[in-house]
Curated annotation (Swiss-Prot):
<feature type="binding site">
    <location>
        <position position="27"/>
    </location>
    <ligand>
        <name>[4Fe-4S] cluster 1</name>
    </ligand>
</feature>
<feature type="binding site">
    <location>
        <position position="249"/>
    </location>
    <ligand>
        <name>[4Fe-4S] cluster 2</name>
    </ligand>
</feature>
<feature type="domain" description="Radical SAM core">
    <location>
        <begin position="4"/>
        <end position="227"/>
    </location>
</feature>
<feature type="binding site">
    <location>
        <position position="67"/>
    </location>
    <ligand>
        <name>S-adenosyl-L-methionine</name>
    </ligand>
</feature>
<feature type="binding site">
    <location>
        <position position="266"/>
    </location>
    <ligand>
        <name>[4Fe-4S] cluster 2</name>
    </ligand>
</feature>
<dbReference type="GO" id="GO:0006777">
    <property type="term" value="P:Mo-molybdopterin cofactor biosynthetic process"/>
</dbReference>
<feature type="binding site">
    <location>
        <position position="155"/>
    </location>
    <ligand>
        <name>GTP</name>
    </ligand>
</feature>
<comment type="function">
    <text>Catalyzes the cyclization of GTP to (8S)-3',8-cyclo-7,8-dihydroguanosine 5'-triphosphate.</text>
</comment>
<dbReference type="GO" id="GO:0061799">
    <property type="term" value="F:cyclic pyranopterin monophosphate synthase activity"/>
</dbReference>
<keyword id="KW-0479">Metal-binding</keyword>
<keyword id="KW-0408">Iron</keyword>
<dbReference type="Pfam" id="PF06463">
    <property type="entry name" value="Mob_synth_C"/>
</dbReference>
<keyword id="KW-0456">Lyase</keyword>
<keyword id="KW-0342">GTP-binding</keyword>
<comment type="subunit">
    <text>Monomer and homodimer.</text>
</comment>
<keyword id="KW-0004">4Fe-4S</keyword>
<dbReference type="InterPro" id="IPR010505">
    <property type="entry name" value="MoaA_twitch"/>
</dbReference>
């Protein structure tokens, strides 16, 4: 369906849980999070109701996120049921891949089309530091397994932070020459724990691109959040997601469902609607989703204000 600004909204990002088995420095506090009561989070059946209703309004792309979506007990069942909605054309997931190796084959059979893997360092000790305890070898094994079963595309999402991992930019780029893997560099955002790191850690996409004259621009869809490039030798693209230096609001085609059941029309807006109050009434749920999509804000003002208006952490909204 169209919002009031004429944009086609066909993409729903679903945070199935705010819990995670890592505690990345820009996402979660060191002590982790307080576990929510069961009644305060969406059950898998409720999530599916929202997905089904959204599909009736023209949503045909679903991405499951977290927290870490693979710790949700029924994630395979949720993917399978979503795949049976005839109008849903694409089911994707963003994961840290710690648990992916043992699950990816069944998830692919259930209907998962592609994965984005959050990976902010290729160095074992640094990865452990950024994630506060993660085992990078589990991620590497998950990538290898995903490639071996034909999962395509596989994209690596990397948040670049000055003085932390910016010396690995070339190493990440070179992955696209060696493997059929896309890499997405994401600008650090002043949201949640990222506010602490932003002043000293922010690097613009343009700064990175300007240092790589051999990058070749690739045509990008209007709704894409990434500007795409590749090397002559690349097997896949290199993308730059630049919410702080080049916002993509005019082509935005997405809304977000949080693990608490709130529908956010914009990542960086305070505006949200609690759909848990409506999941028992199909018509009311459909109407509330329709209303929220229609009233999606024209744009965010994070570039001008250097801060997101959203008071939620990224693990609550979905990465």
């Amino acid at each position: 369906m169209l919002d009031k600004h004429g944009r086609e909204i066909n993409y729903l990002r679903v945070s199935v849980t705010d819990r995670c088995n890592l505690r990345c420095v820009y996402c979660m506090p060191p002590e982790g999070i307080i576990k929510k009561e069961h009644d305060n989070i969406m059950r898998y059946e409720e999530i599916f109701k929202v997905v089904k209703s959204a599909s009736l309004l023209g949503v045909n792309k679903i991405r499951f996120t977290g927290g870490e979506p693979l710790i949700l007990k029924n994630i395979d069942k949720l993917i399978y049921n979503t795949s049976k909605i005839s109008s849903i054309k694409d089911i994707a997931m963003t994961t840290n891949a710690i648990l992916l190796e043992d699950m990816v084959e069944e998830l692919k059979k259930a209907g998962l089309k592609r994965v984005n893997i959050s990976l902010d360092s290729l160095k074992e000790d640094r990865f452990k530091s950024i994630t506060r305890g993660g085992d990078i070898n589990k991620v590497f094994k998950s990538i290898e397994k995903s490639l071996s079963i034909g999962m395509r595309p596989i994209k690596i999402n990397t948040v670049i932070m000055k003085g932390i991992n910016d010396d690995e930019i070339d190493d990440f780029m070179n992955l696209t020459k060696e493997y059929p893997i896309s890499v997405r560099f994401i600008e650090l955002m002043p949201i949640g724990e990222g506010r602490r790191l932003y002043k000293d850690g922010y690097i613009s996409s343009e700064e990175i691109i300007s240092k790589h004259s051999d990058l070749i621009p690739v045509e990008t869809e209007k709704s894409s959040t990434a500007l795409l490039y590749k090397f002559k030798e690349s097997k896949e693209n290199i993308g730059f997601i630049s919410p702080m230096s080049c916002k993509f609001c005019s082509g935005c085609n997405r809304v977000r469902l949080t693990s608490e059941g709130t529908l956010k029309p914009c990542l960086h807006s305070e505006k949200e609607v609690n759909l848990k109050n409506y999941v028992g009434n199909n018509q009311a749920l459909l109407s509330k989703i329709n209303e929220t999509i229609y009233n999606k804000p024209l744009e965010h003002h994070m570039i001008e204000e250097k801060e997101s208006k959203s008071k939620k952490m990224m693990y609550q909204i979905g990465g």
